[in-house]
Amino acid sequence: MAIRRLFAGLVIAILILGITSVATAETLNYKFYTRVVKSETFLIPDVDGHEVGLNVRDGVYAFENGDVAFGTTIVFFDRTKGVGSLNQYGTLTFRDGSTVVTRTVGTTGGTAAKSTGEIIHGTGRFQGIKGTVMSPEIKFFRLEKGESHPKSFGDGILNYTLPPK
């Protein structure tokens, strides 16, 4: 009798544990290329070269798993002679229509920038996503004639979990 109860308890435990899914952490590394499509800059007359503003960047994001996304990033900046801080909201739209929205903060130093932040929203296969995003080094091309801001490229990392299905 005791063996039957033990066996029944074991079967029930296996069924319960088997039905419950656990969210697992995922990491997606990517490369990106962006360009400024809109820009507005305002000079602040407190010190030489101080400016604030925003720009909108569009670009392509290629992930190491073969996935590709189109990205739009709204960048708010405060810098003096090209060095300062930035706050960004980015939206990655994947080929299947799923999206990942991020909010990052960072620094810019003339020819390079870096940012870290969090994933704040997702749709489609990324519904319920939670996690972080990081671009350890964003590099800028030389400013070309007629450009208000240079094109950028770099690497990034998405670390995230999705809710159990």
PLM feature spans:
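Bacterial N-terminal signal peptides that target proteins for export
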Residues: 1-10
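Bacterial N-terminal signal peptides
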Residues: 9-18
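Beta-strand-enriched cores of mature, soluble protein domains
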Residues: 24-165
